[in-house]
Structures are given as C-alpha cells and as structure tokens.
Amino acid sequence: MQTQITLLRFDDRLPLRKTIATIERQYETTLTSKTVYDVTKRVADKATPAYNDIKRKIRRATHLHIDETKIKIQGKTYWLWIFRSRNNVFFVIRKQRNRKVLDEILGYRYRGIIICDGLSAYEEYSRYLQRCWAHILRETRDLAKKHDDAKPMHQWMKDLFAKVKSTSVRDPPKKRKRLYDKCVQEMKKLIEIFSSYQHISKVTTTIQNGLDFWFTRIIHPQIEPTNNNGERSLREMVVMKKIIGTLRNEDGADVMAKVMTLVSTWRLNGASPYYSLKALL
C-alpha cells in the first residue's frame, strides 16, 4: 500500500483528498492526511541512500542541465532546483538561489559543462557553461513581434543558432575552433549594431553578458545548445506545485524532492516507477 500511496501522490500527482479517496476505495480502509504524510515520509527515508547515489552520479556527469523555479513552503519563497544528466534527474529544494546550492550539490571541483539560463550564480561557480539558446531566442522573437527594427536582430540570432547546431563530433577540432571564433566576432558585431536601440538594449545586454558562453557547443558538440531537457524534467514538478499549492514544511519538501528524484530518474531510463519503488522498499 505504501508504494501505491506514494505514487498516487507524487507520480500521478493527485491532490491529498483524491489520494485518500482512491486508497479508501481500493483497500476498503480509512486514511487521514497524517497517515498519507507518514507513509510518504517513511518511503523517502528508505529512498535516501538511492537519492544520495544519484547525487554522486550527478557530480560525475560530463555535462548537466540545471534550472530552478520558485516554490512556496508555509507561504515563503524557496527554490526548487533540478540537475539533469543523460541518465539521472536530481531535485533539491533550498531557500537560496545562489552559488551555495551549486557548491553543496556539485562540490567545489565540478569540471563538467553546465547548460543553464543567465542566473549569475552559474558564472560565479564555473567557466564551463552553455547558455540556453531557447531562452534568448524567445526574447528576440518577442521583441521582433513588437518592433519591426528588431526583426533583423532576431533573424541574425537564428542564423547564429543554426551554426551552433551545425557542428558535429566528427568535425575536426581546428574547424570547430575557427567557427567558434567567427561566431563570437559576429555576435560582437550584432551587439555593436543593436545596443544603440534603446527599446532593444535590455536584450543586447543579456547577449553581451553571455558572450563567452553562447558558443560552447561548437567546441563541445556532444552537449545541447538549449536547456530544454532541464525545463522538460522540471515541468512535472511545476504541475505538481500548482496542485499542491504551498508545502506545509521543509520535511514535506524533502519528501517530494527525494521521491520525484527517483521517479523521474526511473522514467528517464525506461524503468517502471511502481516495480522500482516496490523493489526498493
């Protein structure tokens, strides 16, 4: 029953009321909200070694998609962080949205490439970054819809993105380096031209601030140029966040992070959350 309760709550994303109603119907028993919490807390405690093992694997990953979003605990703002590698997904909820979280989860010597947005914590933590092209292209697209004189900039950015995507691990390193240098020079020219447009200056500043990190994929074509994988894995948690509303305490947040880490990792690897959790317990 504990497997069923936990997955109804965190995999099927049922509200507490519906979780209780489903279990009471299926097992002809009576449940309280405290019982549901106690069960999921015991499951999370048993899952802690597996959770920590995923954290160790995340630390060894050659590249990571990292993202963060707000979450409420007792009405106060916390941050839900996701760390996703090729085969693992790791969630953690913290008060901070800064480098301290990266130091805690990845340690002080992580040398993999981080695919991320423009949060300054990433640049403070590492110089091995790939800025997310999906984010910046959404910004330039929105500007182009509002201002005709922003359309050439958006098209130019799309052309640069096409060059970023065009590189392959089969391309010789020297060829990739030439393309990298060419793209950096092109982007500098773009910034120079469009930074004088006051209504575009915010976006050109964003582009300027990430200049060293837009073209990392050209040198390392094994990585993705967008953080879509991170955002995709975060999406289910965002849906759950809307269903749950505000979490009651940090213990409940810890339960959610641990269970969803395991469920998301199992799904990413094509494993059944039901049988995997049952075997773990």
PLM regions and their residue ranges:
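Catalytic center-proximal scaffold of phosphoryl-transfer enzymes
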Residues: 1-281
